[in-house]
Amino acid sequence: MARGPQSDLPVGALHGVERRTGRDSAERVAEPAACPCARDAYRPLEAGRPLEAERPCPTPQYTGFGTATAANARYQQLVSRGTTALSVVFDLPTQMGYGSDAPLALGKVGRSGVAVDSLDDMRVLFGGIPLDRVSTSMTVRAPAALLLLMYQLVGEEQGVPADRLTGTIEYDVLTEYMARGSHIFPPEPSLRLVADTIGYCRTQLPRWNTVSFSGCHMAAAGATAAQEVAFAPADGIAYVRTSVAAGTDVDDIAPWLSFSFAARVPASEEVAGFRAARRIWARMTRGEFGAEHPASLTPRLGTRRYGALSAAHLPEANRMTADIEVAVVELLSRIEELGGAVGADGARPDGEEPCAFLLVDPAVEARQAERMAKLRAWRSHERVGAALTGMRRTAAGTGNVLYAMKDALAAGATVGEVCDALCEVWGTCTPRGF
């Protein structure tokens, strides 16, 4: 029997009901939106009804330019064309909790996303964007709580009630220790900060999705399909366990969590992995925590392109015409011209293909540092200092640190200053080699 290239598990020519053993097949597969939710988190549409009429599916464009001003121009353009979902990517210094004027941020400001150092930057980033009419996804982990609070503060300035703000923070910080390395604090206080964020959102931002478990990043770091499906729920259970221990009910937590897995080939292995993840999650949340709400047992799941399969040169997808035979012959002729059936990385076009790269102006870094200098000049240093002291005191205790963190950000504290203050209490993390 052949074995799957991603999972290394036996793959038969046909997997029917007779292969399901140990449990009744109906119990293991169930109907869509029914526990254990192996098939889908939503019920199927009625026959004949268009998808948009039943459940609109906005597709946010992953976007973040060097400065808040440049990124805002892009968001304004997207919203003017009907977009109702935005996806913000931050630069590496912001993801690591550094200010744009920090020595370790040199050469990285605005390179991989938008630089956000303070509430003032967040105001510019979402200036003119009606936050009650868009859903915003923020791809950030270690400092996610800070950026979420800034977003809430901008919403308050717009007069938008907190219960009208919707979006997602991809707050799977444990992934950083395993796959990416963009962590700030040691694992234990990082878990606490996630739990504090979950508890805060359930009372202050009730429509916010708090954590998306990033199996896709584990896959990009080398995890097999089975490892990806095992590690992501393991992270999720750690967050739920910490939040429940802090006093949050599991049915107030689990419905606002989701999975993000890699989309690989063959699709059959990925579909099997997705179904397995849903079954495992339902059993774990109900078995260990006593979850009862249907949404707690039917997790939402999304996929992303598995980046490891991408190459510098990929053949374009060709539309098949009615005369498919002619199209196939043309493709075969082209393949022969390229030297036969070779790998994607082996084929090279004649000459250089035109490719427009996004070049970040080096002046972005200087302008961002200048903005921070102006901020420090006009803000109240006494108010900022008192707020940071209060946040340190809360971090050293057992209270929810987000309330004190929000006060510090509202006073004008920067991302770097807030992270530095927490590092004074919690320390930093330098992982040991394997």
Predicted regions and their residues:
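Acidic/polar, glycine-rich intrinsically disordered N-terminal extensions of enzymes
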Residues: 1-121, 125-132, 155-160, 348-404, ...
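Core alpha/beta catalytic barrel or barrel-like domain that forms the active/cofactor pocket
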Residues: 46-63, 85-101, 111-112, 121-144, ...
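Glycine-rich anion/phosphate-binding loops
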Residues: 65-80, 142-153, 187-193, 230-231
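Generic secondary-structure signature for well-ordered alpha-helical cores
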Residues: 80, 84, 127-131, 156-161, ...
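A glycine- and small-aliphatic-rich helix-loop capping segment at beta-alpha/alpha-beta transitions
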Residues: 104-106, 153-158, 185-188, 230-231, ...
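Short, contiguous, pocket-lining structural segments
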Residues: 228-232, 269, 273
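Extended amphipathic alpha-helical segments enriched in small hydrophobics
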Residues: 270-278, 316
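Long, amphipathic alpha-helical stalk/connector segments used for oligomerization, subunit docking
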Residues: 311-347
